Amino acid sequence: MPTINQLVRKGREKVEKKSKAPALQGNPQKRGVCVRVYTTTPKKPNSALRKVARVRLSNGYEVTCYIPGIGHNLQEHSIVLVRGGRVKDLPGVRYKIIRGALDAAGVKDRKQSRSKYGAKRPKPGQAAATTGKKK
């Protein structure tokens, strides 16, 4: 344990916290170009084909991004907006593509949590006809 005199002379060393999304360089989002769009399988207890894309960001970094929602229109050379946010069952995937921005279309026929998937508000008359629920 240091003496008061030692603390006055040197002070405490600050512990810098490590960024969870270093490729964004402190920005909320970054633009990038899809280099490869493919599916991959999740870690042990889960089973699925998760849609992911390898994206080259505008700052030169190349990252693996998750494509959220059901169905997508992304292919090689698509321009996408990338945000932070990991996918727990996909090792090495620490970023997500923002749906409804740039070349990534919003999820079709999405009724709930629309803002997260870039889906527009359904027309009032159409909504009642398409939902399968009774009142």
From Swiss-Prot:
<dbReference type="GO" id="GO:0015935">
    <property type="term" value="C:small ribosomal subunit"/>
</dbReference>
<feature type="region of interest" description="Disordered">
    <location>
        <begin position="1"/>
        <end position="29"/>
    </location>
</feature>
<feature type="region of interest" description="Disordered">
    <location>
        <begin position="106"/>
        <end position="135"/>
    </location>
</feature>
<keyword id="KW-0694">RNA-binding</keyword>
<keyword id="KW-0687">Ribonucleoprotein</keyword>
<dbReference type="GO" id="GO:0019843">
    <property type="term" value="F:rRNA binding"/>
</dbReference>
<comment type="function">
    <text>With S4 and S5 plays an important role in translational accuracy.</text>
</comment>
<dbReference type="Pfam" id="PF00164">
    <property type="entry name" value="Ribosom_S12_S23"/>
</dbReference>
<keyword id="KW-0699">rRNA-binding</keyword>
<dbReference type="GO" id="GO:0003735">
    <property type="term" value="F:structural constituent of ribosome"/>
</dbReference>
<comment type="similarity">
    <text>Belongs to the universal ribosomal protein uS12 family.</text>
</comment>
<dbReference type="InterPro" id="IPR012340">
    <property type="entry name" value="NA-bd_OB-fold"/>
</dbReference>
<comment type="subunit">
    <text>Part of the 30S ribosomal subunit. Contacts proteins S8 and S17. May interact with IF1 in the 30S initiation complex.</text>
</comment>
<dbReference type="InterPro" id="IPR006032">
    <property type="entry name" value="Ribosomal_uS12"/>
</dbReference>
<keyword id="KW-0488">Methylation</keyword>
<keyword id="KW-0820">tRNA-binding</keyword>
<feature type="modified residue" description="3-methylthioaspartic acid">
    <location>
        <position position="89"/>
    </location>
</feature>
<keyword id="KW-0689">Ribosomal protein</keyword>
<feature type="compositionally biased region" description="Basic residues">
    <location>
        <begin position="113"/>
        <end position="123"/>
    </location>
</feature>
<dbReference type="GO" id="GO:0000049">
    <property type="term" value="F:tRNA binding"/>
</dbReference>
<comment type="function">
    <text>Interacts with and stabilizes bases of the 16S rRNA that are involved in tRNA selection in the A site and with the mRNA backbone. Located at the interface of the 30S and 50S subunits, it traverses the body of the 30S subunit contacting proteins on the other side and probably holding the rRNA structure together. The combined cluster of proteins S8, S12 and S17 appears to hold together the shoulder and platform of the 30S subunit.</text>
</comment>
<protein>
    <recommendedName>
        <fullName>Small ribosomal subunit protein uS12</fullName>
    </recommendedName>
</protein>
<dbReference type="GO" id="GO:0006412">
    <property type="term" value="P:translation"/>
</dbReference>
<dbReference type="InterPro" id="IPR005679">
    <property type="entry name" value="Ribosomal_uS12_bac"/>
</dbReference>
